[in-house]
């Protein structure tokens, strides 16, 4: 399991990744954000995808389309995760 956590102005996010053969098999999300459904939606888009930068970017783009009001928060999440998994 690979765990990452960060505190943003809009809430804290902790992600636990189970990675098998380079692919994300499971993601657990812990957040005190007022909109946890946005983070959960994003995390669900990562399951069964490769654990790499492109996956994060694609999942963020899909989530931004579903939740356009949270574009800025999702961009912050993307910037953090891309740096954290490199």
Each language-model region and where it sits:
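Active-site- and interface-proximal helix/loop "cap" or "latch" segments in soluble metabolic
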Residues: 23-86
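Structured beta-strand/loop patches that form or line metal/cofactor-binding pockets in enzymes
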Residues: 1-19
